[in-house]
């Protein structure tokens, strides 16, 4: 057998580079226009809606849909995804798995694959489902990994996979997600809903009524570039207005953040530096000032809250650790001077104050605490339910805060079996294991099967599953501690991945099936996840490249293997499904929105329902807390949760508290050995790991072909590092290479590598360096607490040095090493 590193043009006979990639990556747009005519088609994406110029069966050019007045530059990366050298082109099977089956786990990750036919691949997939259900039972199959997928109401790859696999047999699934695992678990106890995915007070109400806006670990200018559905970018119009008000001194905006983030640089607002992972200590001191100086809203606390009298003794040092949470106490932890803490507390109650929290601070050890304590602060300020006051946990996400029109978006493909239907293997014996596990504890399950953990008031017994099915999801991006993952994956017998790009998850799989991108199929999607601005027709722009197929086609073929394909499809093809979803949507909106017949909508490409009515979160509760009670056990804001207290957890008790971290920079545990905090926040130029494969767009920010690591110039100088140097970042969990970018936006002791950088190990061995710069090579795989058991990615300290020696090639991109 010959072994060659796959190049993009390999195996494509009698074609030129231009005919495969499309001229837009090789020639200028003006040159294309001179030689082509073609057609324009409307489609959409997480990055926004656009019109695509199609000529010769290829996408030549993209331009933002005219409704989007603030398009993101990431639209420039879409062609790079579609025509990426990292596309999964054919069904592939890992060579050693095919030769030795499960006994080859030690070579998993060596990226050596052999091409097979579609029939062979589906047969192998089905054979493994049969073997696992027969040999072990449903506890041995995990099909619950989920992610952002691609946009589109019909082609939801997770739903399509889980319906097909569920028709065959039961399986292990998950609860929660990586983005907001701690927040969505704690907030129902405190404010009665997850809050993180709830519509927030309209931006117009904030702009008209707020005197102070606190952006707490929140970077909306960066994060609002993308959306769960097709993004409208309406939020940026409000941010433009906010910038004007900041410049005129009409609104006081403060960013509480270790770094000067993109939003702070855009708004030119005040920045309050705080040591990483110390927000709760800072907030407790703020509460101390508000209470001892009698600045808090006593009437609001008495009318709308429960448990303040149990919480305040902790602040005063009369319970629990018996330490008074004074500004002097907090200053030694958070790095904010005592008088600055006092001034900040007084500012919070000087006028109408809107707290806007981001998600990063709940992705750390004890991540439940800052969100809970934020709600306590908002309650003490007393403005929850007022225009321009209170607290939000989502104004950086998917256009939350843009007034909703009330449009009911289209439904989707059914995830579950039809009512009354049973799977082929109707076995509900999970061998004493839990059927559902916390989303971030699946690696622990593989490594420690049978281990019992606490989770949200229940006991979970981790299942030692043997097989995974992963569809349109990249856990080798979003989970923590790559070397721990390598050890776990050596225990798995079979991993099947369905995707359009050859991610690290494909590298560590056994069977890889090529799905097509969202621009190679037909669909519809809501335009605006929360605003309900309209509906987008997602036209297929080009035919599926290589041998890729839609998830619908792939899973239909799988169900055909056990005679359930008609039940799976309900007798409809792609366009019949799309039409039916549109017609159901039209019926659901009768009397509210005039929607044309499907053909007219499909030809036009979009519907625009305008802007909705401004709204204030929790206003009804404030107006009448008895009639409009919250969803908490008491119906009130629970400063103290007696329900959580009854759980008896060590790391999440009955009210918010300061807990020291397992590791922390700036004088915290472990900082003598690894003194730098690694911030691995959402990227500025990707959606998580989506678009990292777009070569031309990646080149606009990569440094020597690697992911950037952002470093304070003084920290870099101390280590002999200049802008553009290669840097080795390391701790006891792993090591990576990244390209240095020096910036005063980052304080001493803090570095940033944005998550979503594709993992590219030099070898499959445990401990191998990541050649591109995936920060999760270094992060800690630890549950936030017994309550949420969510990811603690931002509890991570490291060291770094200038890289010396022979520079290894980047192994993240370009697909497998194909054995022929």
Curated annotation (Swiss-Prot):
Its cofactor is Mo-bis(molybdopterin guanine dinucleotide). InterPro entries: Asp_de-COase-like_dom_sf, CT_DMSOR/BSOR/TMAOR, Molybdopterin_N, MoPterin_dinucl-bd_dom, Mopterin_OxRdtase, Mopterin_OxRdtase_prok_CS, Prok_Mopterin_Oxidored, TAT_signal. Keywords: Metal-binding, Molybdenum, Oxidoreductase, Periplasm, Signal. It is found in: Periplasm. SUPFAM superfamilies: ADC-like (SSF50692), Formate dehydrogenase/DMSO reductase, domains 1-3 (SSF53706). Residues 1-33 form the signal peptide. It holds the Pfam family Molybdopterin_N. Mo-bis(molybdopterin guanine dinucleotide) binds at residue 179. Binds 1 molybdenum-bis(molybdopterin guanine dinucleotide) (Mo-bis-MGD) cofactor per subunit. GO terms for cellular component: outer membrane-bounded periplasmic space. GO terms for molecular function: electron transfer activity; molybdenum ion binding; molybdopterin cofactor binding; trimethylamine-N-oxide reductase (cytochrome c) activity. It catalyses: trimethylamine + 2 Fe(III)-[cytochrome c] + H2O = trimethylamine N-oxide + 2 Fe(II)-[cytochrome c] + 3 H(+). Predicted to be exported by the Tat system. The position of the signal peptide cleavage has not been experimentally proven. One of its GO terms (biological process) is anaerobic respiration. Its EC number is 1.7.2.3. It is an enzyme of class 1 (oxidoreductase). Reduces trimethylamine-N-oxide (TMAO) into trimethylamine; an anaerobic reaction coupled to energy-yielding reactions. NCBIfam families: PRK15102.1, TAT_signal_seq, torA. Belongs to the prokaryotic molybdopterin-containing oxidoreductase family. This is Trimethylamine-N-oxide reductase. The lineage of its organism: Bacteria, Pseudomonadati, Pseudomonadota, Gammaproteobacteria, Vibrionales.
